Design a protein with these regions (language model features):
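Auxiliary Fe-S-binding modules of radical SAM enzymes
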Residues: 2-17, 211, 224-302
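N-terminal-biased segments
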Residues: 15-17, 24-25, 41-42, 46-47, ...
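Conserved AdoMet/S-adenosylmethionine-binding subsite of the radical SAM
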Residues: 108-264
Length: 302
């Protein structure tokens, strides 16, 4: 059994309680305008190229079977349309200008890496988080991985956008200790405008997961011009007040730090000029949501 992944991040402290290791899966059913991990959207392999890091060594030209790299008078030319995603160029790149997103990892390989820091999990109350992309697009792998981790006493957290069939969640529920659940907008039409899909399934899945009794942390990416108006914030607070097992709501500030990622992948940055919300705006939203009986905090303070 293998998974398509983009990264494994150790000593993650914002992906659940304690010190954690986060496995990032590739592929997502949504396409959020503000996505800060654009390399995780597509299910296909993608090669990232950062021209400012290229030293012109030509090692990539020598190993590329598709002739997707050229070194000429104008420097390094990457012909993306010719790239086959084999990753050979990344292996020999001396300047770290090339990075392949979308590699295979076996269940045993992932488990062994994730267990390397078990002592830190135990001393900090941490564990393992799976994120993405959307990990539930590879639910069978997550189920098998979480089962092994639970059998060895490791806390498991699932970071999800909610836009998958509930039957996929049913596979992992027995082995999941915590959900990190995204809520992007309460209005379905505006939700679809922002991420490409309506929100009915997401809201329905949240209510079902709440009934399992598993801890849920809600994450609201707070994006000026998208979901920062009072009507939307109150709508989210009112909806969340139905849930009984939400540990807290984190109002996460939008940031534009992913601009270089979009450029390196030759992807359109669909929200490039929006400023990050102020501390005052984050606190205001958290206070409104808290007024509905759900603990909410600013993502900058937690």
């Amino acid at each position: 059994m293998t998974a398509n992944y983009i990264d494994i991040k150790k000593f993650a402290v914002h992906d659940g309680p304690g010190i954690r290791t986060t496995l990032f899966f590739k592929g997502c059913p949504l396409k959020c305008k503000w996505c800060h991990n654009p390399e995780s959207i597509s299910f296909e392999r993608q090669l990232s190229y950062l021209p400012n890091k290229c030293i012109g060594c030509g090692e990539c030209v020598a190993v590329c079977p598709a002739a997707a790299h050229e070194i000429g008078d104008n420097g390094h030319i990457f012909i993306r349309s010719s790239c086959e995603g084999c990753g050979k160029c990344e292996e020999v790149c001396l300047g770290d200008a090339l990075k392949l997103y979308g590699k295979e990892i076996t269940l045993d390989e992932a488990y062994d890496i994730l267990m390397e820091d078990k002592s830190f999990y135990e001393t900090s109350g941490g564990g393992v988080t799976v994120s993405g992309g959307e990990p539930m697009m590879q639910a069978d792998f997550v189920e098998a991985l979480f089962k092994k981790l639970c059998e060895n006493g490791v806390h498991t957290a699932l970071d999800t956008c909610g836009y998958v069939k509930y039957s996929e969640y049913e596979k992992v529920i027995p082995y999941t200790k915590m959900f990190l659940y995204d809520l992007k907008h309460i209005d379905s039409k505006k939700h679809e405008e922002a991420v490409g899909k309506p929100n009915e399934l997401i809201l329905e899945n949240l209510l079902k997961l709440d009934k399992t009794g598993i801890d849920i942390e809600i994450r609201i990416p707070f994006v000026p011009g998208v979901n920062t108006d009072e009507e939307t914030v109150r709508g989210m607070g009112e909806f969340l007040s139905q849930c009984k097992h939400i540990t807290r709501v984190k109002v996460l500030p939008y940031h534009s730090l992913a601009g270089s990622k979009y450029e390196s992948l030759d992807m359109e940055n669909t929200l490039p000029k929006v400023e990050s919300p102020s501390d005052e705006l984050l606190d205001w939203a958290a206070d409104i949501i808290s007024s509905y009986g759900v603990k909410a905090v600013s993502g900058r303070k937690s």
